């Protein structure tokens, strides 16, 4: 079964029943702030033989998937840009699943693999260029654009906690990286947007936003461990899940956190509820996916992706 979604000027409703929707859509504070043309995406309901790895997209903010040779046991240890890299077995061989930072320059790159005997091998690959759209938002709370000195001190403390969560590494890997959509709602802001708040440039959008009513349940897209919860200046009430081998997801702006640090959650288990905490223009869930400490597009973890 296929579902066609074409961008008009309104957000689209996406059901969790089709797993995570591959979306190139964005509704900023108002749809007039961003203009997208020529986008048409097809979502295909996954079959029993669906791809277990994320979709390869070797662009800044994307994912490179590199087959490794020789096929030895145990799995080789792989590094890229000083970070340990996820290695999964797929199609009968080891594959390096590499998260590419949004700040990465297009061009040649290399990962290095080391086998159990200490022998190393380099795997070159190319990062393609990608231009992300611009988003302009207007915030009524000026502190969210120009924080006070006290706010800045708090933000600095919180950034240390957030970075520590994103740097988490556990050896255990999930057998499948196919996601569930964390919440029923409308994709209102896509990944990678170059953001301006009240005409002031800010960091690119490091996840996707899903607009939904306050109190709408949020579920774990994959099984994992709760490695951090808290309430942060910009992010509001937040949950971090560690899914193994450098794959970490973050859920922001909650009204309620339904899990405790240290808990193990299954795929589809409720972890919180949609809210308006932190820096927001309306109720929504901000969902970030981090792979080897690089923020990557969450839609690459969806069952199928076809661009037209």
Describe each model-derived feature in a short phrase.
Residues 11, 15-31:
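Short, low-complexity intrinsically disordered segments enriched in A/P/G/S/L with frequent Arg
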Residues 53, 124-235:
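Surface-exposed, glycine-biased beta-strand/turn segments
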Residues 180-308:
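Catalytic cores of peptidoglycan-degrading enzymes
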Residues 33-44:
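Bacterial N-terminal signal peptides
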Residues 4-7:
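Tryptophan (W) side chains
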Residues 49-124, 129-131:
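Cationic-aromatic interfacial patches
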């Amino acid at each position: 079964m296929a579902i066609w979604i074409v961008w008009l000027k309104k957000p689209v409703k996406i059901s969790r029943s089709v797993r995570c929707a591959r979306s190139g859509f964005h509704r900023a504070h108002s749809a007039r702030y961003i203009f997208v043309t020529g986008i048409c995406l097809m979502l295909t309901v996954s079959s029993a033989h669906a791809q277990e790895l994320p979709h390869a997209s070797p662009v800044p903010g994307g994912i490179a998937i590199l087959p490794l040779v020789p096929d030895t046991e145990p799995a080789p240890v792989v590094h890229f840009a000083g970070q340990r890299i996820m290695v999964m077995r797929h199609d009968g061989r080891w594959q390096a699943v590499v998260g590419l930072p949004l700040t990465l320059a297009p061009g040649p790159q290399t990962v290095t693999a080391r086998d159990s005997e200490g022998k190393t091998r380099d795997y070159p690959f190319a990062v393609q260029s990608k231009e992300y759209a611009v988003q302009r938002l207007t915030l009524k709370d000026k502190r969210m654009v120009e924080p006070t000195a006290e706010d800045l001190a708090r933000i600095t403390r919180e950034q240390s906690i957030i970075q520590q969560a994103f740097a988490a590494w556990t050896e255990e890997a999930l057998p499948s990286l196919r996601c569930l959509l964390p919440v029923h709602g409308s994709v209102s802001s896509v990944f990678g947007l170059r953001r301006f708040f009240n005409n002031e440039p800010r960091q690119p959008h490091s996840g996707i936003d899903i607009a939904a009513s306050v109190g709408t349940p949020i579920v774990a897209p994959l099984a994992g461990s709760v490695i951090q919860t808290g309430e942060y200046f910009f992010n509001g009430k937040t949950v971090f899940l560690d899914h193994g081998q450098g794959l970490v997801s973050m859920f922001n702006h909650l009204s309620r956190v339904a899990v405790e640090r240290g808990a193990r959650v299954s795929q589809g288990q409720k972890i919180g509820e949609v809210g308006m905490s932190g820096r927001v223009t309306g109720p929504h869930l901000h969902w970030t996916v981090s792979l080897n400490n690089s923020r990557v597009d969450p839609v690459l973890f969806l069952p199928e992706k076809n661009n037209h």
